[in-house]
Amino acid sequence: MKLNKENERIVLSGHEAIDILSEIEFILISLRNIARHYYTDASGEVSQKVRSAYCEETTQFIDKNNVTGRLSKVRGVISERFSHELGMENMDDIEREMEKMIYWEKPVDE
């Protein structure tokens, strides 16, 4: 990945870094705990009923705890540290890298 020279090193304050790590830790450990609660068999196999309960619990956790909002806030704190100078492709470094991402899309057969 080729970055604008200004973006080769970004700086966060200690408070910002702790806030970001706290958000990530809350989400990551909570999701792990939900999975461990429902997936108790070492093989990872569960009944459809348990899988449905796991999916419902995960969705409720995401919704009730504003996970998308929390992640958006983290993204904003990190993104604001970057220079948004446009490169030759008329995109900044973040846009150029995010363009490579493959995002979830609605399945074609629905």
Where are these regions (language model features)?
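N-terminal acidic leader/helix
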Residues: 2-41, 45-48, 52-53, 103-105
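Acidic, low-complexity, intrinsically disordered interaction modules
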Residues: 39-94
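Low-complexity intrinsically disordered segments
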Residues: 86-110
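N-terminal functional modules and adjacent low-complexity/disordered segments of proteins
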Residues: 7, 15-16, 56-57, 66, ...
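Amphipathic alpha-helices that form helix-helix packing interfaces
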Residues: 17-20, 24-27, 31-34, 67-70, ...
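Exposed acidic/polar residues on beta-strands and adjacent loops within beta-sheet cores, strongest
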Residues: 4, 59, 108-109
